[in-house]
Design a protein with these regions (language model features):
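Short basic helix-loop element that most often maps to the first helix and adjoining turn
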Residues: 3-22
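Recognition helix of helix-turn-helix/homeodomain-like DNA-binding domains
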Residues: 25-39
Length: 66
């Protein structure tokens, strides 16, 4: 099941500012990440997945994990 970064963030009941703070980036940088997830590095993607509690593969590759 593929979900977007926004869906994962909202599912975690977090604001863009909260996620940006945890990733150590400016909120505008995080907003660009949500709009262009193909530009997110693997490291950022894995950190994001840990923060919001969703599997990296589900968010960035649309692969359902077991």
């Amino acid at each position: 099941m593929q979900i977007t970064m926004k869906q994962a963030r909202v599912g975690a009941k977090m604001t863009q500012q909260q996620v940006a703070d945890k990733l150590g980036v400016h909120v505008q940088t995080y907003q660009r990440m949500e709009q262009n997830p193909q530009d997110v590095t693997i490291k950022q993607g894995k950190e994001f997945s840990e923060i919001v509690g969703y599997n990296f593969e589900d968010v960035f590759f649309g692969i359902e994990s077991n």
